[in-house]
């Protein structure tokens, strides 16, 4: 009798295991389908829509104390007004950048359009200071912030976007015309305007900028203004029919 009960119990459990395996397979298929869909959507974003880098802020430690008055007197394109700002402001034409040089030996470089140019400019500033007579070293160069901008080519309904994404959105049109959108789990901040213009800031790499744009593009895609004629052509090209809110 015990062997019969065991066989019956085993027989009853077998279909449940097969169902669980089947469900697991279905879930994996769904995950793969979702991932492939996202990859396809990202590939369908035109290259010219991706953000162009507008400003890169980097820092470096020159590892020596600096006499800012001497630097301002002996270097070209340098100005120093300690009553206004406690740093020498120095400029380069190639690459077109501005450096803030502090007495502690810390330096901030702004205005470069690429990571390479930011590094190259910082090294040029360091050499200028070295030629003046300071024992400069080039240490701890780091990109602190990358700013990019783009135009998604369709107008956006900011009111509906703000209603559906309250956790991520700060929108006060009386104070600032754009919507401030903070990326979840990142430090990237997006300024989104009704015209479709977007500014992205807070990234450390170009890859961070592109990934943030890929995410926000498909969010904004669902908030196109309904009366935008160009959206229909865009939808046909992508073969996608999103829900559009007016």
From Swiss-Prot:
GO CC term, one of those recorded: nucleus
SUPFAM superfamilies according to UniProt: TATA-box binding protein-like
Annotated compartments: Nucleus
PROSITE patterns reported for this sequence: TFIID
Keywords for the protein's UniProt record, in alphabetical order: DNA-binding, Nucleus, Repeat, Transcription
GO BP term, pick one: DNA-templated transcription initiation
Region feature Disordered, mapped onto this chain: 1-27
Presence of keyword Repeat: yes
Keyword Iron in annotation: no
Tree of life domain: Eukaryota
Segments annotated as Sequence repeats: 53-129, 143-220
GO MF annotation list: DNA binding
Subunit structure: Belongs to the TFIID complex together with the TBP-associated factors (TAFs). Binds DNA as monomer.
Function: General transcription factor that functions at the core of the DNA-binding multiprotein factor TFIID. Binding of TFIID to the TATA box is the initial transcriptional step of the pre-initiation complex (PIC), playing a role in the activation of eukaryotic genes transcribed by RNA polymerase II.
Family recorded in the similarity comment: Belongs to the TBP family.
HAMAP family, per database record: TATA_bind_prot_arch
PANTHER family tied to this protein: TATA-BOX BINDING PROTEIN (PTHR10126)
Name of protein: TATA-box-binding protein
